[in-house]
């Protein structure tokens, strides 16, 4: 199997959650855990985006860098971490919890200048995710590259539950 075929198999296994296939590929070539595809996306970011908790777990067990920044070549996908990808994609609480428990940083900026909490405030009104990020060190007063807080973004997006949660977090600081 050539490298291109390996990468296609890897990203297909990741997207579809084929854990045994993924383990087999990583056992044969552990470096695949941190190899970007032709679009500049990481396997961990891809699995996180698609909410594939089993694949995320396997990749982390095989040494995937939890805070690695992708180098996206796709115009509408910023270069980001797996945590950003999880928040912009399926928003799986299990995946986000796994990433945070494995040391995912909430303070890394993606190429759009957003912290994880800003991404969450933009994409979701799920309090559970906001609280997880706050419990793992996300700063509710942090500014993105445009000078906005996550609360500003939540209010713009009409994510009222998120806004209430962030208001309380700012008040508690």
Regions found by a protein language model. Name each.
Residues 72, 76-80, 84-97, 101-102, ...:
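Alpha-helical adaptor scaffolds
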Residues 4-10, 36-42, 69-84, 109-115, ...:
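Ankyrin-repeat boundary/"N-cap" motif
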Residues 1-10, 102, 136, 145-148, ...:
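Ankyrin-repeat-protein effector appendages
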Residues 21, 54-55, 94-95, 128-129, ...:
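Conserved ankyrin/ankyrin-like repeat signature
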Residues 17, 51, 90-91, 124-125, ...:
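Ankyrin-repeat intra-repeat helix-capping/turn positions
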Residues 1-29, 34-41, 45-53, 57, ...:
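Intrinsically disordered, low-complexity regulatory segments in ankyrin-centric signaling systems
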Residues 23-31, 57-65, 97-105, 131-139, ...:
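Ankyrin repeat domain, specifically the short helix-to-loop turn at the C-terminus of the second helix
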